[in-house]
Each structure stands twice: as C-alpha cells, then as structure tokens.
Amino acid sequence: MIENILNAKKPTVIELFAGTGGMALGLEKAGFETKLLVEYDKDCVATLQKNRPKWNVSHDDIHNINFKGMKADVVTGGFPCQAFSHAGNKLGFEDTRGTLFYEFARAVKEIKPKIFVAENVEAILRNQDGKTIKVIMDVLESFGYDVRYEVLNAVNYGVAQKRKRVIFIGTKKGVKFQYPKHQKNSITLSDALKDVPD
C-alpha cells in the first residue's frame, strides 16, 4: 500500500489531468494533502472549484507549467486515454492526445516524487503491438524508478462498476510495493444506492 511507503504524517500529492477530481478525492479520504491539481477542461475546473474551493487548481495547458522546484511525495494522473482506446481509433502516440504521456513523464522527472501513479485504459497494453507500453516503461524507468503495472477492475475494490484500468506505479529504487488485494464481496448498484432517498 502507498500509505505504508511514505513516512510522512500527511503525504502531499500533485495531480495532473485531474478531471473532476476522482483520484484526488480518494487520496484525500486516505489522508493525503493535495497541493496542486492541473486540468485544462474549463467545466472540470469549475466542478473542482465548486466541490473543493480550498484546493489549488490550475486551469492551464500542462505544456505551460514548469514543475521544476515543485515538491510532492506523490504525482498522480490519468493522461488522456482517447488515443489508446477502442473509441479513439487506437492511434497511440500518432494522436496528439497520446503525446500528453510525455508531459506526465516530464512532471515526474522535474518533481522527483517518491511515488507516481498513472492510470489508463486496458487497450494501452496492446496498442501498436505492445510498442506503446514499452515506450512508457522505458521512459519512466529512465528516471530511476521501479515501475510496474497491473490491470485492476474497480468492481473488486468497493465500486459498483466494472471498470478495468491499467494502474502504473513507480517507486524510488528499492522501495517495496504491493497492489491491494481484491475485496471478497462485490458491491452491487442497489448496494451503492440503498441510502439514496426515493
């Protein structure tokens, strides 16, 4: 578990491609302090600011942000998946959205967190006959991290939705990490909605 790796009372996080803050909310619930969220979409930014007015949200193109000098224990982000998904024609790095992976990588290189977490669609593993995943691993490992990935399904972790995602974890060399174990019982949609008034 990540919490066991970080020896800080309240580990700090910088989240890239934050969307409406799903990952940040989960980390906040786990005791992490969000230092910065970067998001380009104005509607997502408005949602973030409405739901968490105290969060530091940067409404900017990630290309414009200089991460040098920034500090955080963890960097997270779901770099845009459309370039790797079935719906997005699977063009990979040939699609400009696919090249945003390199901006995630640049942030990791400049911030030098103890850990980074990235997520993407399962199809990224097969994109361009496996060349895409090799590039991703080579780039991230070149910064001195042990990098691993695993396909996790949200339904196995207390979410009432079957949603498979590749979760990349990078840790400083020598740090042990273990993915969380599956929960024994899945939550159904009716379980999730049981307290919602009619």
Regions found by a protein language model. Name each.
Residues 17-18:
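Class I SAM-dependent methyltransferase "Motif I" SAM/SAH-binding loop
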